[in-house]
């Protein structure tokens, strides 16, 4: 499969079938459970803030593999796993979950547009190579997780769950925890499983299919 087949355009090939829907459903369930466990197992003292949010290490590969479906997986996991199951009221969990899009949409855009220009795989399968790892480290680990920490904590601040004077600590803890999870788990999943996922025809070539 050629790298240039990946873009942000509508691409109905391969068509959406039962096996793909099952794959996305399983991924959503996995991310939801891991998101919930991450929040309750290693809490920071603020609702839905984890000291080590391991779920992000899974979500980044899901977004790079499944494109728009990865966004859906992220929103479901954030609303249900990190939100409702963690004790957040439903009316607040829904907008909290959609904040995930603010992080994951730019990530996919950068990988699908700038990745090939820098000679990097748009689905992250070259993270075990120097160029691919450095690109992933800058885009997926450092910048994306900083943005996640800022936007997520700002939403919790608006909800009244994180006081203003605690924002610097909460943002820093969120950022560091996410970076560790993505750098370790995300790198391994992308490097080991991306060729398999692509070979099975499960990667999404356009924005959604």
Label for each model-derived stretch:
Residues 4-6, 24, 28-32, 36-62, ...:
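Membrane-embedded alpha-helical hairpins and interfacial helices in multi-pass inner-membrane proteins
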Residues 1-17:
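Short, Lys/Arg-rich, polar N-terminal cytosolic tail immediately upstream
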Residues 71-72:
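Nuclease catalytic cores that cleave nucleic-acid phosphodiester bonds
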């Amino acid at each position: 499969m050629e790298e240039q087949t990946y873009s942000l355009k509508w691409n109905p090939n391969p068509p959406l079938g039962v096996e793909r829907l099952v794959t996305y459903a399983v991924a959503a369930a996995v991310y939801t459970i891991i998101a919930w466990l991450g929040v309750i197992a290693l809490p920071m003292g603020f609702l839905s803030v984890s000291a080590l949010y391991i779920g992000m290490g899974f979500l980044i590969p899901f977004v790079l593999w499944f494109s728009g479906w990865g966004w859906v997986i992220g929103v479901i996991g954030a609303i249900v796993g990190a939100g409702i199951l963690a004790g957040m009221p439903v009316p607040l969990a829904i907008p909290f979950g959609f904040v995930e899009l603010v992080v994951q949409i730019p990530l996919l855009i950068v990988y699908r547009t700038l990745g090939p220009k820098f000679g990097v795989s748009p689905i992250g399968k070259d993270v075990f190579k120097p160029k691919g790892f450095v690109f992933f480290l800058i885009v997926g680990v450092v910048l994306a997780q900083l943005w996640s920490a800022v936007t997520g904590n700002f939403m919790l601040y608006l909800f009244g769950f994180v006081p203003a004077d605690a924002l610097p600590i909460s943002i820093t803890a969120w950022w560091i925890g996410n970076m560790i999870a993505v750098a370790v788990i995300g790198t391994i999943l992308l490097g080991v499983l991306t060729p398999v996922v692509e070979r099975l025809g499960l990667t999404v070539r356009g924005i959604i299919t």
